[in-house]
């Protein structure tokens, strides 16, 4: 995931590659401290056996205009950090919710990436729009109620399949829509990088180094 244009103030337009955002300017040290403290507090709250209604509110933090607040707090955090990782999980779910049909088409196109990755992603078959929302919600839920590293590995696998789907669509579009094909290829590259970042975060979490 690399920096994209500032579109987080328009949450209805959410392509699969929208997983990095540039937050408004502020004191970098203060902003970083606030981002990390907020991420730590949210993770502690979610993993402390909270009531179902509180867990539901945590899962839906990025719903509606909440994405803007999260972007201002977390979007400039390093990819392999607790706030940067949470940002990616929330944006992944929000992006899917806003265009589940597109994501399901990309997932179907990318299922050939490899059997293990598809299994780890854990998407029900056939992978329709409802299944896309279900899996990204389950990933966030698992981050709070299960093994955090496993949730990140599942998110990484999901991103890898989508990236493969984007690459497949790019190949199909090359002959008649070269510009669109290049855009898909770049999106695929960014999402594959996101998957790698999530795996690195999972490893850091297991070693108690994800902060």
Please provide the spans of the model-predicted regions.
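N-terminal domain-start signal
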Residues: 1-94
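Short, charged, intrinsically disordered terminal tails
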Residues: 3-6, 198-211
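Arginine residue identity/basic-tract feature
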Residues: 6, 21, 44-47, 57, ...
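Histidine (H) residue identity feature
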Residues: 8-9, 30-31, 36, 169, ...
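Acidic-enriched, low-complexity/disordered segments with a strong bias for Aspartate over Glutamate
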Residues: 20, 27, 53-56, 63-65, ...
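Generic structural signal for hydrophobic core residues of well-folded globular domains
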Residues: 42, 46, 61-65, 74-78, ...
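Long, charge-patterned amphipathic interaction tracts in eukaryotic proteins
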Residues: 50, 68, 75-134
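Helix-driven interaction modules
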Residues: 106-202
């Amino acid at each position: 995931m690399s920096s994209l244009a500032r579109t987080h103030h328009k949450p209805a337009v959410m392509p699969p590659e929208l997983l990095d955002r540039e937050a408004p300017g502020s004191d970098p040290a203060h902003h970083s401290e606030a981002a990390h403290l907020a991420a730590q507090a949210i993770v502690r709250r979610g993993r402390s056996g909270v009531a179902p209604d509180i867990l539901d509110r945590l899962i839906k933090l990025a719903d509606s205009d909440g994405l803007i607040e999260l972007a201002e707090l977390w979007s400039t955090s390093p990819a392999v950090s607790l706030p940067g990782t949470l940002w990616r999980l929330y944006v992944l779910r929000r992006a899917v919710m806003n265009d589940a049909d597109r994501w399901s088409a990309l997932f179907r196109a990318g299922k050939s990436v490899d059997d293990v990755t598809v299994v780890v992603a854990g998407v029900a078959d056939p992978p329709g729009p409802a299944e896309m929302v279900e899996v990204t919600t389950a990933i966030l839920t698992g981050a709070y109620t299960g093994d955090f590293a496993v949730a990140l590995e599942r998110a990484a696998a999901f991103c890898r399949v989508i990236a493969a789907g984007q690459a497949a669509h790019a190949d199909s579009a090359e002959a008649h829509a070269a510009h669109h094909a290049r855009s898909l290829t770049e999106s695929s590259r960014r999402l594959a990088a996101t998957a790698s970042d999530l795996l690195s975060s999972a490893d850091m979490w297991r070693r108690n180094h994800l902060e």
